[in-house]
Amino acid sequence: MKRWSALAGLAVGLVLLVGCREVRVKTLAAGTTTVPGGNQILIVRDAVALGKLGIHAPVHFKGEFGVALLMGPHDRTGYKQIVESIRANPERVRVVAFEQAPADGGEPSPPYRSYTLWIVPNSVYRRGIRVEVVTPSNEPIAATYLP
């Protein structure tokens, strides 16, 4: 009986360890794009979709996918995104982020949006997971689901 409970304990421990694996998410690019729109979080699965966003980055779509956070539009130069945290659990990914206005007020410019592009391994892609972006004060910015 003791042997059975020891094996059961070991099995539970292994399941917990496998479930707690660390995922390496890389911030590949940050910048601006002139593609019109508002605040969005987008899942990018191919080079064509990435190009339509006006983002040019060397993503290897065979083994990874992109997550792009676009914020704006702005009509003054100098806005940039600050990402405070990214937390994930089996139901959702929560990004806490905001935009920092230029200290000098910026210069007038044609409308643009700031973006941050993350690269995520395909091995963690789970259809239906909610991806949400909120401000540090918990106000919603954008949300989507992994298609």
Describe the function of each predicted region.
Residues M1-A8:
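Bacterial N-terminal signal peptides that target proteins for export
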Residues A8-L16:
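Bacterial N-terminal signal peptides
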Residues V18-P147:
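Exposed, flexible binding/inhibitory loops of compact, secreted disulfide-stabilized domains
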